[in-house]
Each structure stands twice: as structure tokens, then as C-alpha cells.
Amino acid sequence: MLVPKRVKHRREHRGRMRGAAKGGKTVAFGEYGLQALTSSWITNRQIEAARVAMTRYMKRGGKVWIKIFPHKSYTSKGVGVRMGNGKGTPEGWVAPVKREKVMFEVAGVPEEVAREALRLAAMKLPVKTKIIEREEVGGESDEG
């Protein structure tokens, strides 16, 4: 599972997720991508479950890029603990994902296999998603 090697502070503020993602909105590495339509925290377990679902369906063919990383710790206090007495103990790691962020990319498999693999991965995630294709940017041509 994905966890940071080391962090400066074990406990973080929750923060808030307003607006859309600033970067990572397009398919950069693969041919197809899974884009978030809503914002949410995605845990390292959910990322791993989505990755396993994709790679199993693709029968270890093709390549998968995970473009999110769970760098934020979340805490919780024990059951029956009274208010106060400081912040709770770190329980796990989450990746804050804003809407329009491309979370996973796939390449090296046929279109129908890629779409089904990404659909299976989307079922494991707590956000609404859509499958997008790589947009070929019209660059300079060496014609004429």
C-alpha cells in the first residue's frame, strides 16, 4: 500500500477542498484515464483496491499509472474517549482529490479492455468518475 516514507508532521489539519484541481486534468502518460467528477479523500486502501481490480481485469497486460498519492494523515480518537485531551492518533493516509483530477491512466490494451478496467476501478472509489481519452494536441507539422 502507498504510504509516505517520512513526514515532517504526523498530524495534519483536515483542510477543505474548494473548486477544481489546478493540474493533472488531462491524460498525460497513457491512452485512457479515470477522472474524478466530485471531490473527496481517497484512502491508500481504496487506491490499492482500484489498482488490483484494473490489473486483474487486464491480466497483467498493459501499463497502469497511479497519479494520486496518499500524503495526508487522518486521525481519530478512540471510542468512548471524552472531548479534549489533544488530537487523536494517526489512523491512516488519504489523497485529497479535487474534481476534474485524473487519478489513473491506462495504456497498452484495447479500448474496450481499458474502459472496462477503469469502470471496475471506479466502483472501488468514493467519487463519481468519468473515463476520458488522451487528446492529441495539434502541434507543428513538417509538411510542405
Swiss-Prot record:
One of its GO terms (cellular component) is cytosolic large ribosomal subunit. One of its GO terms (molecular function) is rRNA binding. Keywords: Ribonucleoprotein, Ribosomal protein, RNA-binding, rRNA-binding, tRNA-binding. The keyword Ribosomal protein applies. It comes from the Bacteria. SUPFAM superfamilies: Ribosomal protein L16p/L10e (SSF54686). One of its GO terms (biological process) is translation. InterPro entries: Ribosomal_uL16, Ribosomal_uL16_bact-type, Ribosomal_uL16_CS, Ribosomal_uL16_dom, Ribosomal_uL16_sf. Part of the 50S ribosomal subunit. Belongs to the universal ribosomal protein uL16 family. Binds 23S rRNA and is also seen to make contacts with the A and possibly P site tRNAs. NCBIfam families: rplP_bact. This is Large ribosomal subunit protein uL16. The gene is rplP.
